[in-house]
A protein has these predicted regions:
Chain B
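Juxtamembrane amphipathic/hinge helix adjacent to a transmembrane helix
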Residues: 35-39, 254-292
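Alpha-helical transmembrane signal-anchor/signal-peptide segments
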Residues: 27-40, 44
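DG-centered beta-turn motif at the end of beta-strands
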Residues: 41-43, 84, 134-135, 141-162, ...
C-alpha cells in the first residue's frame, strides 16, 4: 500500500503504539484485551465441555491429553482502544509554530491520528490552553479524513493564552475506559501542575510527548544581548550572552528535562522528545522500546 | 549584513542629533532693546486712590505705578536700559542715568520702590512743562521717555492760551502713560509731618489759572477787580478732584511726537514701551540646540512608542483572523 | 542660593515619556515558550536594568535640556575689604557752579561734575563696597538702595551733575541716609559720605531724630564740604561781636552738630577738584574694614551638559542595540540528548511483531499494515478513501 499523498503535511506512517496492560472493550481491534477471544495469540487450552467450540479443537493437544479429554484452543481477546491526544495549546506552544515553517506538533498529532485509524482504533483529541478549546477537539472517531483535517487545523492554531489550566478541565471528557493518551505539551508549567494533570489521567495509559526546541535549550554561542519575551506572560528578560551563561543555560535545560523525566517515570512512561521536527522513525523507535 | 533594524536607525539618529544639540549650534539674531528713562509724577494727585492692589484693597496711583512699572521693566528684553526720574512742579529730576535692567534689576526695583510723594519739592503740577523739560534733558542722552502721570495740571492750564512745543518731535520717542481712573476721586491731603488729614476741598485749590496777564474781556467776569481780582472771582470747579486726563495727555503726546497708553497690567505697559520707544537692535546669539534635541527626543519616542502602538493596532484588527478556521 | 531653573518649565510636562523605556525595549524581542528557559543571571539582570535606565535617562536629559535647564545666577557672599557706604549727595543748584562760583565753562568744571568724576573713580576702585546713593536738596530722595552692583552706583552718581533744585535740607537727607543701611551691612563697616557745598539749619526735631538714629546705628560720618570761593568754611569763626548763630554760620554749626552726635566723624574741606580727590583718597584709606559683600555668579546654562549626557546614554544604548542577538536567527543545536535515545528506554517489553518493525526502515514501515490487523471494515484504509471524505470532514469533526 502506498502512503497517502502528502497534501496535508508530511507522509504518514503506521506507528507501533501499544497499550500498557490489557484493554477492555468488546469491539474487536488490535490490542490485547481482557477476556478470551476467538482469534489472535494462543492463550491456553480449554475443555470442549467448557467451551463448546468444535472449530477450535486442538487435535494434537487432545491426543496428548492423558485423560482423553477434547481440548479446545482459547485465544486472547483483542480489542479496539481509543487513542487520545491531549494537546496543550497555551501561548508557549506557539513557539516557532507560526504556520510558515514546519509544525512538528501538527505533524505528530496527524501521524498519531493516522496510525490509530489505520489500526482500527478510534482517535480523539482534546486541546486546551488556559481554557478548554472545545471547537478544536475531536471526539473518538475512526473517520478517515480526520488526520488531514486535523493537520490543517492545528497548523493554523498556534496556541495562545497564559497557562494550561484548561487541560485539567478538558481531560474530564476522556472516556472512562482505559485509553492510550498522548499528552503533547512543552511541559513548561510548574511541576505541581504537571503532576495534577498526570494524576487526573490515572485511569489511562499516559504517553507524554515533550515538545522542545533546541533553539531555546542551547542559545546562540555568540556574545551579545538577547532579549526574550515569554510567549505566555509577555515577560521580558534581557540576557547577556556569553560562554559561561550558555553553559549555565544548557545545564539549566538539562536539569529541567531531568526533573520532568522524574515525574513521568513516577506516573508511568518516559516521555518522547519532539525536538524541533517530527521524526516518525524516532517516534516509532520510542513506541517500540519504551512506549506502547 | 542584513538591513539594520529601524530601531537601530532611530537610535543612531537620536545619538547624532543629541551630539549636534550638545555642540550648541548658534545663529546670530538681532534683538530689539530699549533705552528709556521713566519719569514718575509724584505730585499730590498721585496719592488719589483709584487703583486696587492684588488683594483688592484701594491703592494709590503712585503705589500702582511703583508695582507695575518695576514688573513691566523686568519684562523688557535683556540689554535694555532704564533710568529713573521724578516730576513735580514744572521740572523733572533725574535720579539715575539709564543702566542695564537685567544686571541691575534689584537696584532698579529698589529705587522704584523708594519713590515717595515726599520727594516732591513743590506742590505744583505743570505736566506739559515737565514733559518738555524731560524731552530737553533726554535729547542729548539719546534715551526715550516713559512719562507716568495722571495729566492733572495744578493749577489748571489757561484755556485761552494754546500750548505749543518748540522742540524737535523726532529727537526723543516714547510715551506718556496715563495713571488713574476715569472717575473723579478726591485727593488726600497731608499735614507738615506727612500725615493724611482728609481730602482737598474745592476752596483749597485754584480752580482756574491765575498765571500771566488776564485774558481779554476779563472785565466782564464776575467779581472783577482790576487790582485785586484781575481774573474775576475763582469759579467753582472740580480741580480738587482728579481723574486721568486721557484726552489732554493724548494731545500732549501728539504735540511732542510721543505715544499714549493708559497704565494697565505690567505686560501691557511693557508692550506699550516696546511699541513706542525706539528699538536698538543688539546682536544676540540664538541657541539652535533645541531643534536637534527635540528631533532626538522625537526619534526616541518613536523608538519606544511605536511598537506598543503597533501592538495595540494589531490586537484590535485581527480578532477574526486567529479564529478564521472555525 | 544655588538653584536650578528652567526657561521653559512647560517642557517638563514631557517627562512622563521617560516611563516608556520601562514598558518597551529598544531591542527586538525573541519569543520563547517560557521565561524560565533561561537561567537566572545577575549580570544580565543588571544590564537589563541598565538599558531601561539608559533609555529613561536619555529621555529625561533631552527633556531637561529642552526645558532650558540652567543654574540660576546666584549670589555668593564674600568677605572683602571695604565698607557699606551711603553717598549722600547735595543736588542743590549751587552744585552746578564751579569752585570759583562761576558758570562752568570749558576750562573749569562745576562742583557736581567734579564730584561725579571723583566719586565714580572712588566707587570703581572699591569692588568690595556696597553702596547706596541718596540725594537731597529741597527734599531727600532715595536714588539707589544699598547695592553691590557698581553699574547701578555709577548710573546714580552719573546723574548728580544734572541741574539741581533750590534748597539744601541736610537734616532730612541725613535721616534718610541713616535709614538706608540694611541688615546685611555689618555694623562696623557703615559709613555715610555727605557731599555738599553748603549747609543749612537743621530743624530741632530733625536734630533729635538724627541723634536717636546715631545712637541706634553707629556709623562713621564723613563730610566732604566743597567750599566755594568766597563762601564761609567749616572752621570760620564769626568775628568777635557778630552773632554766632546757625543761621549766619550754618557750616560751622553743622560741624559742631556732627561732633555732638558721638559718631566717628571727619570733615574735609575742599576748595578745588584736587582737594576733593585728596579727601576721597583719604576716605578710601580710612574705610578699609572687613565687609561681607555679595558677588553674583551669572547663570550657567546646563542644557549642553544634558545633551552630552543624553548622547552618552544613547551611545551606550546604540552599542547595546548593535550587539543584539535574536533567537530567530538561530536554528539551535541539538546539544541536549533525548533521555530515551540515550539508552534509558526499554521499559515495556516488546510485543509480538515488534522486532520486525524495529528492523524495518521507514519505507517498510508504511507499506506494511500492522500484522495483527483485524478484518478491515468497509474496504480498508485506502488512501483515496481518506481524501474522498475531506469535504465533509470539518463539519463532522466540529
Amino acid at each position: 500500500m502506498s502512503p497517502a499523498p502528502a497534501r496535508d503535511g508530511p507522509p504518514r506512517f503506521d506507528l507501533p503504539y501499544r497499550l500498557f496492560g490489557r484493554a477492555r472493550g468488546v469491539a474487536t481491534g488490535g490490542h490485547k484485551a481482557l477476556g478470551q477471544g476467538a482469534n489472535g495469540a494462543f492463550l491456553r487450552h480449554a475443555s470442549l465441555l467448557e467451551q463448546p467450540d468444535a472449530r477450535r479443537i486442538d487435535m494434537r493437544a487432545s491426543l496428548l491429553d492423558p485423560f482423553g479429554g477434547l481440548k479446545v484452543r482459547r485465544f486472547e481477546h483483542r480489542a479496539r482502544i481509543d487513542v487520545f491526544v491531549v494537546l496543550d495549546l497555551s501561548g508557549s506552544m506557539s513557539f516557532r509554530r507560526d504556520g510558515q515553517g514546519e509544525d512538528p506538533v501538527a505533524d505528530l498529532c496527524a501521524a498519531i491520528a493516522h496510525a490509530a485509524i489505520r489500526s482500527h482504533d478510534r482517535f480523539g483529541l482534546i486541546a486546551a490552553g488556559p481554557e478548554p478549546l472545545a471547537e478544536l477537539g475531536v471526539r473518538a472517531t475512526a473517520r478517515r479524513g480526520v488526520p488531514d483535517e486535523l493537520w490543517r487545523r492545528l497548523s493554523a492554531e498556534p496556541g495562545a493564552g497564559r497557562g494550561s489550566r484548561g487541560l485539567l478541565a478538558a481531560v474530564e471528557e476522556l472516556p472512562q475506559r482505559r485509553a492510550l493518551v498522548f499528552v503533547v505539551s512543552d511541559f513548561l508549567m510548574p511541576q505541581a501542575e504537571i503532576e495534577d494533570l498526570l494524576g487526573a489521567l490515572w485511569r489511562h495509559d499516559v504517553a507524554p510527548v515533550v515538545v522542545r526546541s533546541s533553539a531555546v535549550e542551547a542559545p546562540p554561542p555568540r556574545f551579545g544581548l538577547l532579549e526574550t519575551r515569554d510567549l505566555e506572560t509577555g515577560r521580558r528578560r534581557l540576557l547577556v550572552m556569553r560562554p559561561s551563561l550558555r553553559e549555565k543555560w544548557i545545564a539549566h535545560a538539562r536539569a529541567r528535562r531531568a526533573a520532568l523525566d522524574e515525574s513521568f517515570r513516577r506516573f508511568g512512561r518516559p516521555a518522547f522528545d519532539l525536538v524541533d521536527r517530527f521524526d516518525a522513525d524516532a517516534f516509532a523507535d520510542h513506541l517500540l522500546t519504551g512506549g506502547a | 549584513m542584513r538591513r539594520p533594524d529601524w530601531r537601530t536607525v532611530a537610535l543612531g539618529a537620536a545619538l547624532a542629533l543629541g551630539v549636534v544639540a550638545a555642540l550648541q549650534p548658534e545663529t546670530e539674531a538681532e534683538r530689539p532693546t530699549y533705552d528709556v528713562v521713566a519719569f514718575v509724577d509724584i505730585t499730590g494727585s498721585m496719592n488719589a486712590r483709584d487703583y486696587r492692589d492684588a488683594s483688592g484693597r484701594p491703592q494709590s496711583r503712585l503705589e500702582a505705578v511703583k508695582t507695575r512699572l518695576s514688573t513691566a521693566v523686568g519684562r523688557l528684553p535683556c540689554g535694555s536700559k532704564m533710568g529713573l526720574g521724578v516730576f513735580t512742579e514744572r521740572r523733572v529730576f533725574l535720579l539715575f542715568e539709564p543702566m542695564d535692567i537685567c544686571r541691575n534689576y534689584g537696584a532698579i526695583a529698589g529705587a522704584i520702590a523708594g519713590l515717595d510723594w515726599r520727594m516732591g519739592w513743590e506742590g505744583d503740577s505743570r505736566v506739559a512743562s515737565a514733559v518738555f523739560a524731560a524731552l530737553d534733558m533726554l535729547a542729548p542722552m539719546n534715551a526715550d521717555i516713559v512719562f507716568l502721570t495722571d495729566g492733572q495740571e495744578a493749577p489748571p492750564m489757561r484755556t485761552d492760551m494754546p500750548l505749543e512745543y518748540s522742540g524737535d518731535k523726532d529727537k526723543v520717542k516714547g510715551l506718556l502713560v496715563g495713571v488713574g481712573g476715569t472717575e473723579l476721586v478726591p485727593i488726600p491731603k497731608h499735614d507738615d509731618f506727612g500725615r493724611e488729614t482728609g481730602f482737598y476741598a474745592m476752596e483749597d485749590v485754584p480752580q482756574a489759572s491765575r498765571l500771566g496777564p488776564p485774558p481779554t474781556g476779563a472785565e466782564n467776569l464776575p467779581g472783577y477787580n482790576a487790582r485785586n481780582a484781575p481774573f474775576g472771582e475763582m469759579p467753582a470747579g472740580e480741580e480738587h478732584l482728579t481723574s486721568v486726563r486721557e484726552s489732554y495727555l493724548g494731545d500732549l503726546g501728539r504735540m511732542t511726537g510721543l505715544g499714549y497708553a493708559r497704565l494697565d497690567q505690567p505686560d501691557a505697559l511693557a508692550q506699550a514701551i516696546a511699541a513706542n520707544a525706539r528699538p536698538r537692535p543688539v546682536p544676540v546669539a540664538v541657541d539652535l540646540s533645541p531643534l536637534p534635541a527635540a528631533a532626538a527626543l522625537l526619534a526616541l519616542v518613536a523608538l519606544y512608542g511605536v511598537p506598543p502602538l503597533a501592538r495595540l493596532g494589531r490586537r484590535r484588527a485581527p480578532t477574526h483572523a486567529s479564529r478564521s478556521f472555525n | 542660593m544655588t538653584g536650578l531653573g528652567f526657561d521653559h518649565p512647560w517642557a517638563l510636562l514631557l517627562l512622563p515619556l521617560a516611563l516608556l523605556p520601562f514598558l518597551v525595549s529598544p531591542l527586538r524581542l525573541s519569543g520563547v515558550p517560557s521565561a524560565e528557559v533561561a537561567p537566572e543571571d545577575t549580570l544580565s539582570r543588571a544590564v537589563g536594568a541598565g538599558i531601561v535606565a539608559l533609555g529613561a535617562l536619555a529621555i529625561v536629559l533631552l527633556v531637561l535640556g529642552l526645558s532650558g535647564l540652567h543654574r540660576r545666577d546666584h549670589v555668593v557672599e564674600r568677605t572683602g575689604v571695604g565698607a557699606n557706604i551711603v553717598l549722600l549727595i547735595d543736588r542743590s543748584s549751587s552744585m552746578d557752579s564751579t569752585f570759583a562760583n562761576r558758570r562752568p565753562d570749558g576750562a573749569e568744571e562745576s562742583k557736581s561734575v567734579a564730584a561725579r568724576r571723583l566719586l565714580t573713580d572712588f566707587a570703581a576702585r572699591r569692588p568690595a563696597d556696597r553702596v547706596a546713593v541718596a540725594a537731597f536738596s529741597t527734599a531727600p530722595m532715595l536714588v539707589i538702595p544699598m547695592t553691590d552692583k557698581h553699574d547701578a552706583v555709577r548710573a546714580a552718581i552719573g546723574a548728580i551733575d544734572r541741574p539741581g533744585l533750590a534748597h539744601t535740607d541736610v537734616g532730612r537727607g541725613l535721616s534718610l541716609a541713616f535709614s538706608m543701611f540694611d541688615e546685611t551691612s555689618t555694623e562696623t563697616s557703615r559709613a555715610i559720605v555727605l557731599v555738599s557745598d553748603g549747609a543749612a539749619v537743621i530743624d530741632r526735631r530733625v536734630q533729635d531724630a538724627l541723634r536717636a538714629a546715631a545712637a541706634r546705628d553707629p556709623v562713621r560720618l564723613y563730610w566732604l564740604f566743597l567750599r566755594t570761593a568766597g563762601a564761609r568754611g567749616i572752621t570760620d569763626r564769626p568775628p568777635p561781636g557778630d552773632p554766632d548763630s546757625p543761621q549766619t554760620y550754618p557750616e560751622r554749626h553743622l560741624d559742631i552738630f556732627f561732633k555732638t552726635l558721638g559718631l566717628p566723624y571727619r570733615s574735609f574741606e575742599a576748595r578745588s577738584a584736587g582737594e576733593v580727590s585728596d579727601a576721597i583718597r583719604e576716605i578710601d584709606q580710612l574705610e578699609q574694614r572687613p565687609t561681607l559683600y555679595s558677588e553674583t555668579i551669572p547663570r550657567q546654562d546646563l542644557d549642553w551638559l544634558c545633551y552630552w549626557a543624553a548622547a552618552g546614554a544613547l551611545l551606550l544604548l546604540l552599542a547595546a542595540k548593535l550587539s543584539e542577538r535574536r533567537l530567530e536567527d538561530w536554528e539551535g543545536e541539538a546539544l541536549l540528548p533525548s533521555p530515551l535515545r540515550g539508552g534509558v528506554g526499554g521499559g515495556g517489553g516488546a510485543g509480538e511483531g515488534a522486532t520486525r518493525i524495529v528492523a524495518s526502515r521507514r519505507r517498510a514501515l508504511h507499506s506494511a499494515p500492522p500484522p495483527t490487523l483485524a478484518l478491515p471494515r468497509k474496504g480498508g484504509g485506502n488512501a483515496p478513501d481518506v481524501h474522498s471524505q475531506q469535504p465533509d470532514s470539518g463539519r463532522a469533526a466540529s
